[in-house]
């Protein structure tokens, strides 16, 4: 099924259909407004696919706007990574990239308008006093002693704030709404605070910065957004969104709609906790292949199509729910099973010497994909010495073991039938070398005498094999909901990364990052974008051929 054929249906699209049918809107204009204070993660991918997907399907527009109102936590590094992630996922924003800081002058004037209307005031309570005055969910707040300042005094004090006349934390601009409101967000929320920090876009022009709830709605209105889509934690904030727009002189009044955020098992989505993983060096960085960041998934070998498909499958609802990790893994398996070229790699090598074959290479033609001839073929060298995986040999085994057993036969993938004749061991009793014979008449065909050979194993030529570091990535956390733990770092999976030294076939010498292969019988792997070089290959496991996590947990 193509993505066009799989166009989703959800409550937001139903609202849009009704708005267009009624004439409330003649076109659709959405936006994706991340704060540039970290790398995007799989949860953001859901919002990206929703906002940009709606714009695509309705021939509308979607803006990329950076909510850059906190210069202390933001950085151009994050701006660039977010743009790269959106484009990599397959989307294009309308017009130029936008920044909330583009509207700082207008936002300031709207704040002045609220002061002139008696709807905003400069407060000089300390942060501790403000928390005390705010009240609780069961008790109303109380008015600040500065709440009833005159319009003239508030205008002068707000200008003093802008001019740098107050120290950080000693003054702020607050909306004058209702300190007894049952909704905490409506208890005179802060609209502006003081921060003496250089801004990555506006430099040192400002020392006062608007809060998200004040900036967000006005930015939407300035840009003509028709449907402002947020996650459920902003549901109560919709009251403030509407209050601000209702009380300033602006024609456009977008409507905010909320949907459930993505909660993915065995993962965390909190930027603070993700940052802790980086700063505590639990992971290598924001793009560590174990991280749920888009850059981490990309480095691990996930495709943009698989992430879009995942977002389509989980859908858009108003109900919070936890999505199983296997749902994401299923999407990448389905994609790579169909599209990834095949190759052979031996992760735990044991040497095989074929005694009845003369030394000398033979180049075998192998399909790049068993079910897709259009993907072509490759030449793989075969010789009298090969590596197989240690797990593919036993000296003794029952009938259920369909691999190589001493005295019995097995087929080499796309090659010959071999028989294990004898073994050589080291002083500790570990098998170091297998000595085998081969049937020269069985290249890609059954033995002439009709004997049955059921098992098939993969291999690489010793002479031609390329050494490679194989990084076996698994789930970063050992419990489904690490965020619920008292110390989420205590739930780190100690086997989330296992490094093996193996060998790969020579066709992988030029493997490029983000191109994923199926290592036959092992899983899906891609060259690491940071460390892999032609003379020092490093491959990351994207996902196994099947889900083995449940068995690990059970055992």
Swiss-Prot record:
Keywords: Aminoacyl-tRNA synthetase, ATP-binding, Cytoplasm, Ligase, Nucleotide-binding, Protein biosynthesis. It comes from the Bacteria. It is found in: Cytoplasm. A motif ('HIGH' region) lies at residues 34-44. Its main location: cytoplasm. A motif ('KMSKS' region) lies at residues 268-272. L-glutamine binds at residues 67, 212. The keyword ATP-binding applies. It holds the Pfam family tRNA-synt_1c_C. It is an enzyme of class 6 (ligase). The keyword Acyltransferase does not apply. GO terms for molecular function: ATP binding; glutamine-tRNA ligase activity. GO terms for cellular component: cytosol. ATP binds at residues 35-37, 41-47, 231, 261-262, 269-271. It catalyses: tRNA(Gln) + L-glutamine + ATP = L-glutaminyl-tRNA(Gln) + AMP + diphosphate. One of its GO terms (biological process) is glutamyl-tRNA aminoacylation. Its EC number is 6.1.1.18. Belongs to the class-I aminoacyl-tRNA synthetase family. Monomer. NCBIfam families: glnS (TIGR00440), PRK14703.1 (NF011291). This is Glutamine--tRNA ligase.
């Amino acid at each position: 099924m193509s993505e066009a054929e799989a166009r989703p249906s959800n409550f937001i699209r139903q609202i849009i259909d009704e708005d267009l049918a009624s004439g409330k809107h003649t076109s659709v204009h959405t936006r994706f407004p991340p704060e540039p204070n970290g790398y995007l993660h799989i949860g953001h991918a859901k919002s990206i696919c929703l906002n940009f997907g709606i714009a695509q399907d309705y021939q509308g527009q979607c803006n990329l706007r950076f909510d850059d109102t906190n210069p202390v936590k933001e950085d151009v590094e994050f701006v660039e990574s977010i743009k790269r992630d959106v484009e990599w996922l397959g989307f294009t924003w309308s017009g130029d990239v936008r920044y909330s800081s583009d509207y700082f002058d207008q936002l300031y004037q709207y704040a002045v308008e609220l002061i002139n209307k008696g709807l905003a005031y400069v407060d000089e309570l300390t942060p501790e006093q403000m928390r005390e005055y705010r009240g609780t969910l069961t008790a109303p707040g109380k008015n600040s002693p500065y709440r009833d300042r005159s319009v003239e005094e508030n205008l002068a004090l707000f200008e003093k704030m802008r001019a740098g006349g107050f120290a950080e934390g000693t003054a702020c601009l607050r909306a004058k709404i209702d300190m007894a409101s049952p909704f905490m967000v409506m208890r005179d929320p802060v609209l502006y605070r003081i921060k003496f920090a250089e801004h990555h876009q506006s430099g040192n022009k400002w020392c006062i910065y608007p809060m998200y709830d004040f900036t967000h709605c006005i930015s939407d209105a300035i840009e003509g957004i028709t449907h402002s889509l947020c996650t459920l934690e902003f549901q109560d904030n919709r009251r403030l969104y509407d209050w601000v727009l209702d009380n300033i002189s602006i024609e456009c009044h977008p409507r905010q709609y909320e949907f459930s955020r993505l909660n993915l098992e065995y993962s965390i989505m909190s930027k603070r906790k993700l940052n802790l993983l980086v700063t505590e060096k639990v992971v290598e960085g924001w793009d560590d292949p174990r991280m749920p960041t888009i850059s981490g998934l990309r480095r691990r070998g996930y495709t943009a199509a698989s992430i879009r498909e995942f977002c389509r499958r989980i859908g858009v609802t108003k109900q919070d729910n936890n999505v199983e990790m296997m749902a994401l893994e299923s999407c990448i398996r389905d994609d790579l099973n169909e599209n990834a070229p095949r190759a052979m790699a031996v992760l735990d090598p044991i040497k095989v010497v074929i005694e009845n074959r003369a030394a000398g290479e033979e180049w075998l033609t192998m399909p790049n994909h068993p079910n897709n001839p259009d993907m072509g073929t490759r030449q793989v060298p075969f010789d009298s010495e090969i590596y197989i995986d240690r797990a593919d040999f036993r000296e003794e085994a029952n009938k259920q073991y369909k691999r190589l057993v001493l005295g019995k036969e097995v087929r080499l993938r796309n090659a010959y039938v071999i028989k294990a004749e004898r073994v050589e061991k080291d002083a500790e009793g570990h098998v170091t070398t297998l000595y085998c014979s081969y049937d020269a008449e069985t290249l890609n065909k059954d033995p002439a005498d009709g004997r049955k050979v059921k098992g098939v194993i993969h291999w690489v030529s010793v002479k031609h094999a390329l050494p490679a570091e194989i990084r076996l990535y698994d789930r970063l956390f050992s419990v489904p909901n690490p965020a619920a733990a008292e110390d989420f770092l205590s739930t780190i999976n100690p086997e989330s990364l296992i490094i093996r030294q193996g060998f790969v076939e020579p066709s992988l010498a030029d493997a490029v990052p983000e191109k994923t292969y199926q290592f036959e019988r092992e899983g899906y792997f891609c060259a690491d974008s940071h460390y892999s070089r032609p003379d020092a290959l490093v491959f990351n496991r994207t996902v196994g051929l099947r889900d083995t996590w449940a068995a690990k947990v059970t055992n």
